[in-house]
Amino acid sequence: MNISKPEQRTLHVLAKGGRIIFTRNSSGKVTFVECYTREGYVLADCTLPVFTKLKNKRLIHSKSGKPYQINMAGLKAVRPQLDNQ
């Protein structure tokens, strides 16, 4: 599966325990997203188009209106990446 660099970065953050907080408009469409790392930092690469691509590829999911998290398909699609912390 072809995954762009911003999508890969977002999936990597989600795989390490991050989450995507979203805002919906009155019709129920997602209008704003922010990706938070498990430490609470905001990931700048996580934009609405990146979120839409990940959602359409079914690599992330949300249950009962909670923040979006990575699912098993997303974990399989993410490539290993060194962590420079």
UniProtKB/Swiss-Prot annotation:
Superkingdom field? Bacteria
Against Pfam families, the record matches this protein to: YjhX_toxin (PF09857)
InterPro entries in the cross-refs: YjhX_toxin (IPR018654)
The text of the family note is:
Belongs to the UPF0386 family.
| NCBIfam families xref list | PRK13687.1
Q: Which HAMAP family match?
A: UPF0386 (MF_00827)
Question: What is this protein's record name?
Answer: UPF0386 protein HCH_03746
Originating organism: Hahella chejuensis (strain KCTC 2396)
Lineage, top ranks: Bacteria, Pseudomonadati, Pseudomonadota, Gammaproteobacteria, Oceanospirillales
